[in-house]
């Protein structure tokens, strides 16, 4: 038998949202009729300019992609209001950059602080580097970070602190004054995950001008509509970006991905419309679910919302199964540490599909 790392004996596989194909096969529903509310995607699709850029790039895919990404960095810097030497680009959405971060800053025995619940990939990635997770608290009832639970856990071993704003899966924001309290309390790297910032219409880029211990991470998978191309970017001080770049995979961002990103960033109207439509549908979902007895839904500043379904008489797994049997994919949040077995996350779809989801949800929980 091949010998593997001891850590893998207790390591759990990351659980992503489920695909239409999976649900169609498992529940016997037509794939084309499925309503997908489980993965926080852009349901309106990518920019037409991005589609054309991908088509135009086909004749280049026999060549290795550009590795230094200078032109893309210029475009991202313009969009993010930073300089290009503050930008790093990664494949696999933002997830590759989490792995590069761990390789850049973590030595065995170091600690990282992560609030719960939040995006589980932080812990999944950093534990691979033999770092120890230390848990802070996200107050579910108030949908906000317990800042003191972060501050009280900072020690000499703390290397990284993760802050997700808007928080996934709750949709709550972390006020900038709370972020500053944490930054000023430590010399550890404070990672601010802004994957969904466009939907909140606020960000923390201005802090880069004052503080060097910040890394802001973003993705093109959400409002930009490029989830299938897997590309993200990070923002920090130039020295830290240069050190990360030394160990980042060289050719992880494909030619079609690079062309699509440039085209999308140059389509300001698409970004604006995608953001506005998602916010409109988010508020529609909130008001509609909020009118259903026995479901508590949390206000959100992202393109998803968290529901507490305990009063329906169903667990999240049970209600998720019933919805999937009707062709609706939602995210059972039982796997999120910090949540119990009664939470479901839903993300926005087109308006007709959101209406159909509400109709099906009411039929299930009100009968």
UniProtKB/Swiss-Prot annotation:
It comes from the Archaea. InterPro entries: Aminotransferase_I/II_large, HisP_aminotrans, HistidinolP_aminotransfase, PyrdxlP-dep_Trfase, PyrdxlP-dep_Trfase_major, PyrdxlP-dep_Trfase_small. Keywords: Amino-acid biosynthesis, Aminotransferase, Histidine biosynthesis, Pyridoxal phosphate, Transferase. Pfam families: Aminotran_1_2. Disulfide bonds: none annotated. GO terms for biological process: L-histidine biosynthetic process. The keyword Cell membrane does not apply. It is an enzyme of class 2 (transferase). GO terms for molecular function: histidinol-phosphate transaminase activity; pyridoxal phosphate binding. Its cofactor is pyridoxal 5'-phosphate. SUPFAM superfamilies: PLP-dependent transferases (SSF53383). It catalyses: L-histidinol phosphate + 2-oxoglutarate = 3-(imidazol-4-yl)-2-oxopropyl phosphate + L-glutamate. Pathway: Amino-acid biosynthesis; L-histidine biosynthesis; L-histidine from 5-phospho-alpha-D-ribose 1-diphosphate: step 7/9. The modification N6-(pyridoxal phosphate)lysine is found at residue 222. Its EC number is 2.6.1.9. Belongs to the class-II pyridoxal-phosphate-dependent aminotransferase family. Histidinol-phosphate aminotransferase subfamily. HAMAP family: HisC_aminotrans_2. NCBIfam families: hisC. This is Histidinol-phosphate aminotransferase. It comes from Methanosphaera stadtmanae (strain ATCC 43021 / DSM 3091 / JCM 11832 / MCB-3).
């Amino acid at each position: 038998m091949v010998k593997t790392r001891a850590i893998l004996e207790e390591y759990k596989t990351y659980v992503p949202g489920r695909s239409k194909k999976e649900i169609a096969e498992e529940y016997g529903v037509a794939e084309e009729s499925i309503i997908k509310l489980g993965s926080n995607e852009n349901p309106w699709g990518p920019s037409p300019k991005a589609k054309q850029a991908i088509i135009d790039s086909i004749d280049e895919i026999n060549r290795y992609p550009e590795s230094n990404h200078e032109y893309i960095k210029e475009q991202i810097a313009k969009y993010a209001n930073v300089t290009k030497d503050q930008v790093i680009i990664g494949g696999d959405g933002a997830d590759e950059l989490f792995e590069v971060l761990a390789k850049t800053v973590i030595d065995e025995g170091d600690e990282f602080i992560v609030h719960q619940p939040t995006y589980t990939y932080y812990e999944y990635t950093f534990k691979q580097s033999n770092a120890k997770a230390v848990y802070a608290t996200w107050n579910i009832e108030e949908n906000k970070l317990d800042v003191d639970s972060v501050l009280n856990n900072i020690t000499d071993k703390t290397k990284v602190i993760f802050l997700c704003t808007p928080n996934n899966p709750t949709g709550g924001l972390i006020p900038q004054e709370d972020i500053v309290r944490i930054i000023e309390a430590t010399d550890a790297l404070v990672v601010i995950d802004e994957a969904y910032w466009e939907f909140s219409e606020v960000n923390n880029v201005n802090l880069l001008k004052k503080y060097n211990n910040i890394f802001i991470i973003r993705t093109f998978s959400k409002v930009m509509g490029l989830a299938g191309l897997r590309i993200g970017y990070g923002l920090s001080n130039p020295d830290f970006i240069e050190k990360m770049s030394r160990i980042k995979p060289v050719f992880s961002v494909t030619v079609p991905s690079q062309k699509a990103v440039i085209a999308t960033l140059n389509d300001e109207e698409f970004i604006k419309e995608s953001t506005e439509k998602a916010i409109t549908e988010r508020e529609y979902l909130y008001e509609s679910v909020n009118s259903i007895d026995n479901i508590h839904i949390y206000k959100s500043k992202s393109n998803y919302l968290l529901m507490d379904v305990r009063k329906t008489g169903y667990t999240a797994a049970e209600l998720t199964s019933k919805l999937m049997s009707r062709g609706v994919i939602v995210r059972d949040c039982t796997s999120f540490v910090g949540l119990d077995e009664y939470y479901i996350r839903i993300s926005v779809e087109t308006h007709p599909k959101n209406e159909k989801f509400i109709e099906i949800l009411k039929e299930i929980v009100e009968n």
